[in-house]
């Protein structure tokens, strides 16, 4: 029997509530499909600050690096906003990504038929949308040097450097090409090569790698056009590959095609070692502990963990099918509530998901 070690990071706010739901479901599907999951909970973010004084204890990072996969719920609380930036909960996530050497962020966007009317776009535009944004996570303008602010004669100047090496582009492009091979075989690389030298390098490297992935159809699109096309005709996209800054913007734009951030999972991967899987949404401290949280994105993040991190695709299929079945049955948490549906709390939604498995 295959055995997998999973570190759970409940974190802050609604994190513990949605983690409990995901864990129950994972225990059921692992038994059904003949593999074993051992769970270890570790503190991160605000909960870690309360327990240890640090947003990312060394013991948490060590446990994550030794695991087969890491499932994170949510980080952040306004009660820590007065702390120095380097001591706030969010720096725990940044440190975790750096410590685990994660460079590829995956954001799937798939329209759930039962929720199609939740989108602000017309049904005929978004029906059938199923795309993946692959964003480079550790390079580009957010991390490039030099950066800073300087005083000049009678003025002040701020500056950042957008930079990528060929090897950085190659490793993120490899991830995107491999995902495209497993999906519908189309990869659109998004850049600004008409004005940026760094984007010209990006495009050249993607083109150089394309022959190694022969069946994959490769196209290029400027980022301004990509932003427009995502709302004009999102069905044209299969896999979108882009850098850190452009991906930060486009992934959030693509997320809202679904109409609810409460349904969106994500993954962050490195060249080797465990991946980090987490919902896109935040910690929602305003509803924490009130049994109002939507656990769906956490459950779908657990499905991504099974499929990508642990290579248990059949179990992932079961979790995703359970989510679809519960929504098709008219069950909703408050954030998704619509006329004619039945509103449930977090725990009751977890019970419906268990019944649907």
UniProtKB/Swiss-Prot annotation:
Primary localization: cytoplasm
Domain of life: Bacteria
Enzymatic class: oxidoreductase
Gene3D superfamilies: Isopropylmalate Dehydrogenase
UniProt binding sites for substrate: 97, 107, 135, 224
Pathway in which the depicted protein is active: Amino-acid biosynthesis; L-leucine biosynthesis; L-leucine from 3-methyl-2-oxobutanoate: step 3/4
InterPro entries, per database record: IsoCit/isopropylmalate_DH_CS (IPR019818), IsoPropMal-DH-like_dom (IPR024084), Isopropylmalate_DH (IPR004429)
Pfam families: Iso_dh (PF00180)
Family membership noted in the UniProt record: Belongs to the isocitrate and isopropylmalate dehydrogenases family. LeuB type 1 subfamily.
Quaternary structure note: Homodimer.
Name of the protein: 3-isopropylmalate dehydrogenase
Annotated source species: Synechococcus sp. (strain CC9605)
Lineage of source species: Bacteria, Bacillati, Cyanobacteriota, Cyanophyceae, Synechococcales
Chain's gene name: leuB
């Amino acid at each position: 029997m295959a055995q997998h070690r999973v570190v759970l990071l409940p974190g802050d706010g609604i994190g513990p509530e949605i983690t409990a739901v995901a864990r129950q479901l994972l225990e059921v599907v692992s038994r059904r499909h003949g593999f074993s999951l051992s769970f270890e909970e570790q503190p991160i973010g605000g909960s870690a600050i309360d327990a240890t004084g640090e947003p990312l204890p060394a013991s948490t990072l060590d446990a994550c690096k030794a695991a087969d996969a890491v499932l994170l719920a949510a980080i952040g609380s306004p009660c820590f906003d007065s702390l120095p930036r380097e001591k706030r909960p969010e720096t725990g996530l940044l440190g975790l990504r750096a410590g685990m050497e994660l460079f590829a962020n995956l954001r799937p966007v798939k329209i759930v038929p039962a929720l199609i009317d939740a989108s602000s776009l017309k049904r005929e535009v978004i029906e059938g949308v199923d795309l993946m944004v692959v964003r480079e996570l550790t390079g580009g303008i957010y991390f490039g040097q030099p950066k800073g602010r300087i005083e000049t004669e009678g003025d002040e100047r701020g500056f950042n450097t957008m930079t990528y090496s060929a090897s950085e582009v190659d490793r993120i492009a490899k991830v995107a090409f491999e995902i495209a091979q497993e999906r519908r075989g189309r990869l659109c690389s998004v850049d600004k090569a008409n004005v940026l030298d760094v984007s010209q390098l990006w495009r050249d490297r993607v083109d150089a790698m394309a022959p190694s992935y022969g069946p994959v159809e490769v196209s290029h699109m400027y980022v301004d056009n990509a932003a427009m096309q995502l709302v004009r005709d999102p069905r044209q996209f299969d896999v979108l590959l882009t850098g850190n800054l452009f991906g930060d913007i486009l992934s959030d734009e693509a997320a809202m095609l679904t109409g609810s951030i409460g349904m969106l999972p994500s993954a962050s991967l490195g060249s080797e070692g465990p991946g980090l899987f987490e919902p896109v949404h935040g910690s929602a401290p305003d509803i924490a502990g009130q049994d109002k949280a939507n656990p769906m994105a956490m459950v779908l993040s657990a499905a991504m963990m099974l499929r990508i991190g642990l290579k248990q695709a059949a179990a992932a299929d079961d979790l995703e099918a359970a989510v679809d079945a519960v929504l098709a049955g008219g069950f909703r948490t408050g954030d998704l509530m619509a006329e004619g549906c039945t509103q449930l709390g977090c725990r009751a939604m977890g019970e419906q998901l268990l019944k649907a498995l």
